[in-house]
Amino acid sequence: MSEKSATVTFGGKSADLPVRSGSIGPDVVDIGSLYKQTTMFTYDPGFTSTASCESKITYIDGDEGVLLHRGFPIEQLAEHGDFLEVCYLLLYGELPTKAQKADFDYRVTHHTMVHEQMSRFFTGFRRDAHPMAVMCGCVGALSAFYHDSTDITDPHQRMVASLRMIAKMPTIAAMAYKYHIGQPFVYPKNDLDYASNFLRMCFAVPCEEYVVNPVLARAMDRIFILHADHEQNASTSTVRLAGSSGANPFACIAAGIACLWGPAHGGANEAALNMLAEIGTVDRIPEYITKAKDKNDPFRLMGFGHRVYKNYDPRAKIMQKTTHEVLAELGHKDDPLLEVAMELERIALTDEYFIEKKLYPNIDFYSGITLKALGFPTTMFTVLFALARTVGWIAQWNEMIEDPEQRIGRPRQLYVGAPLRDYVPISKR
């Protein structure tokens, strides 16, 4: 029992509830015994004030703009690490040694192929199907192809499933893209790094030699790092909730992908890019700023503000730098969308309206420009998000399975429907 406690009083009933402290961050009130003591539940739509679990993986301080993975700042990981190193960190809790990194890279690399029957599985989808619809179906179907790693009580099978998904997700994502545009699938090339392999599978064709640009590969790798995990967001909570029932890991990740597909979650970078295109030029920005400030105008600035961050999203600063590097490498330094983005950012950081409402640029503000420059259509943006977030989902799922306090998720509700009433025969209604 915690030494600290909180007392909740309602009418003549009160409850003494333990207060739990994490290693950093705010304390939480443990309400597990609230109903037993008071016959009341709590009401928190959207879980804005509710901690659903303990976790050692990711920490966010939204007020200060801090994002830590296993204690390491995202800025340091993105600057000095690579994606598979971050994957190892999220899964195992520590940065790997040189030998551990080489072994982990090898194990991931040699799971990149998918079962050959998967290629025929794709033909069941329409050619114009959204790639995210294809991703949901294919990832969910992995349990039918790899049922030797679905026993969640076996730590070895859990780790094999984890490595398989990290390795195969780029292959499946590239296959979804190729199927969507009518080009033949490109098999993985295991002497390439993770990001380079993915870019090659997306953009190579059999009739031409494709050489991956190292600047673009590094940018892709950094995008993967920045999207690897973000604590208990909607899709991660979905993965945990599905996993709490004992569902196999492939089904849980498919559930996360489905949740991520929602425009309020994974589609924000596409919306931000569309907004920049709608504004078009710098001289039109004042008009749209006025619209954004008008509460009666439906227009909203996309790529600004965040559910958690009330300060500058630390990932946005890294993404801004990456965007400049990509556009410079491709000879698009004067890209009009970037000019609009830079001026919008300047205004948001100096205008009292945006400062007061804490509407700072977030990662989606720049990632859409970068992905467009890399050659991806907007329909692939959320697919890339899902690819990168897979390791975070897996790490969170594994942590949940190993948590002795975890039980099947069963939220309560505030019922506002009809009270008890008697059935009336249809002839008398």
From Swiss-Prot:
Catalyzed chemical reaction(s): oxaloacetate + acetyl-CoA + H2O = citrate + CoA + H(+)
Any GO CC annotation of this UniProt entry: cytoplasm
Pfam families per UniProt: Citrate_synt (PF00285)
Enzyme class, broadest EC rank: transferase
Domain of life of the native organism: Bacteria
Keyword field: Transferase, Tricarboxylic acid cycle
Active site: 306, 364
One example of a Gene Ontology biological process annotation: tricarboxylic acid cycle
PANTHER family hit by this protein: CITRATE SYNTHASE (PTHR42871:SF1)
Record family assignment: Belongs to the citrate synthase family.
Protein name: Citrate synthase
Native species: Rhizobium meliloti (strain 1021)
Organism lineage string: Bacteria, Pseudomonadati, Pseudomonadota, Alphaproteobacteria, Hyphomicrobiales
